[in-house]
Every structure is written in structure tokens, then in C-alpha cells.
Amino acid sequence: MTRDLLTTKEVAEYLRVNPYTIYRLVSQKKLPAFKVGSQWRFERSVLDRWLKNQLNIPPAN
């Protein structure tokens, strides 16, 4: 199983926010991410779950 990993820039485009907003959310531990070397990476499935939680969307059955 491969994980679909996104860069900070890709997450910013996906969420339609400035990349600095992504860095701020990560530094405040409000957005799930991990580092590969010096670069932040985001797992798409984790990001989608986080987004649904932020929007209070109930999970699909």
C-alpha cells in the first residue's frame, strides 16, 4: 500500500490558502504533518479526515 503524500504547496493549493497558513497550522500542531528531511509532508487520507472534522461532516456509512 502506498501513501499519497502531499507537499506544503500542494496542501495550500488543495485547501486554497497561502502556504504560510499551512506552516502556521503545522507549527501550532493544528494540522497533521510529518517531516521528510527538512520538508513537511502530508498524507492525503489523514488530511481529508482532518478537513471533515474541521467542517463537522459526519462520516459516510
Regions found by a protein language model. Name each.
Residues 1-21:
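Polyanion-binding surface elements
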Residues 47-61:
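A short, Lys/Arg-enriched interface patch at domain edges and termini
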Residues 10, 19, 36, 53-54:
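N-terminal cationic leader/targeting segments used for protein routing and processing
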